[in-house]
Amino acid sequence: IQEVKKLAAKKGFVIYDEPYKLNIWGFRANSNIPNSFDDEIHIFTNIAKTGRPVWSYLVFKCTTDPGTYWLRNPMNPQGTAILNPGQYINSHGLGLHRGKYKALVQIGRVSVTRDYDRDAILDFNNGKVVTGLYGINIHRASKVGDTIRVDKYSAGCQVFKNGGDFDFFMKLCEVHRKAHGNKFTYTLVDERMESRKSLKNLAIGAALVALVFGGFFLIAPDNNTNEDE
């Protein structure tokens, strides 16, 4: 929880500490391999009714990316939607996914990148960014057990790999709804972007160290010469 708090502070994201109010964070893996459940959804909440927060923290496997079927066959002519990283306040509520089963459905605006080239490769840095209501729901893949490949299960939705994990998540959402109403905030972090920023900062830091030490060695001979004289 401390690492997430640091990340939230750095990005200006909200962490809710009201009892039983869910923090729902997706972490997109440092990978561009399509059709795999290689991402994570982190659910954490304060379970202490009074006093200092006592955090319950759960991690579930998921995908935050569309499957290859929809990358090749987008429902929208501009391309398949890939959710952009960010924090989307009150973006979701309990409802029915495609009218079939209970899930968190999109009720507020989110930003997506339209992957338009239909090559089944996840293009996170190319394409058109748009903001609006696109049915970016949080739901499950197969009802029972693990699902191995994303395929048609995601056209941009955030999808749980395991049906049982999702059922448990729905129970947590019901507790949240009863205590705080039917609005949920979803936060998506792209670990590749964070890794690139870390590497960039590391490179800048290394360059500064090199300049400092390089400057010292450039100055040192002159100082030594003056002392000898």
Q: Where in the sequence are the language-model features?
A:
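Short hydrophobic alpha-helical membrane-entry/anchor segments
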Residues: 195-205, 210-229
